[in-house]
Amino acid sequence: MLNLYGYLRDKAIFVSPTLQVDRPSPDRKESMFGYIYKKDAAAIAVVLCLCLGVGSFFDYQISSALFNIGSMYGRFVEAAGELPFELTASIAGVMLVRSARPDSKASKWLAALGVLINVGLVGYEIIGSLRVGGKLIAFQLVLTFALVIAANFIAYRLTRTTAPDELARWALMVLAVWVAQAIILNVIVKPLWSRPRMRVIEVTPRLNFQPWWVIGNPDKWAYIAAGVIKDGFKSFASGHTAHAAIGLMLAGLPAAAFKEKPSRRRVIFWTAVVVAAFVAFGRIVIGAHFLSDVSCGFALVLALECLAARIAYPNGVQ
């Protein structure tokens, strides 16, 4: 009898003589998409579905209430909103360089790709900033380059003992997600939907609001011929929000410190979620997108990240 009591005591917490609660095993593994906790992904998915539902009925009303073409916050987000992607892609490029091995020709090609990625990001950032214009250019460029350098230094410190193959695996996962979302959004979704942006609707006579579920705009080319910019019909879905959501992949850095401290990995993940949410809000304020646009852009990248993490880390990263 005493042995039975000892067994039950080890397996459960006795709260009262009539109530007992199972004690979770310290070795129990949480359900994962690679390095992403499924319950975290599910929580974000629920919020995005709610936002899409609200946007389905009140997209135009929300944008009308928030629209401010002169908003400094909106302009800053337009210039720097893709910073999470740039940080992540830059770190991925550096990881590819660090993964090079003298005995592997393939790793050397990947290292060259890593160099090209960072050179391309510098040019992309400068050109993008000049296109936006305004007094924020200098501040935004300095902020971007300072954060990229700091992020790469921190990533190096955390992964200095990580195996080269692990560095390459994470970096290639990031690049795969970026390429996939770029093709889906820029080659398929945006041209196919041709949804007019709020800021274009406001200044273009007889150009009406188009719900997100309506695919294609038969009057698009007539308006473009009349002088409306082609970019004005790329509202659905939000590329800035999608790029900001790529920052969630920083939580998957294959560092031993992260594997030993899942809570730290979660802090990075949820911090990136909050940053992406601020970017999404800024895109609505400046009239570049509607609530449904940013919701779908975020959802696309989240789905791609879960899929890529599941493939890259099939056994999960606890």
Where are these regions (language model features)?
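Membrane-embedded alpha-helical bundles of polytopic integral membrane proteins
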Residues: K135-P164, A171-L172
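Membrane-embedded catalytic cores of phosphoryl/pyrophosphoryl-handling enzymes
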Residues: S31-I36, A41-A45, R101, K108, ...
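Hydrophobic alpha-helical transmembrane segments of integral membrane proteins
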Residues: G120-L141, L172-R197, P262-V285
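Structural signal for the C-terminal ends of transmembrane alpha-helices
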Residues: D22-S25, S56-F57, G93-D103, N152-A163, ...
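Hydrophobic cores of alpha-helical transmembrane segments in multi-pass inner/ER membrane proteins
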Residues: G6, L83-R98, T144-Y156, A245-M249, ...
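Alpha-helical transmembrane segments in multi-pass membrane proteins
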Residues: C51, A176-Q181, G297, V301-E305
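Membrane-interface loops
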Residues: Q61, T161-R265
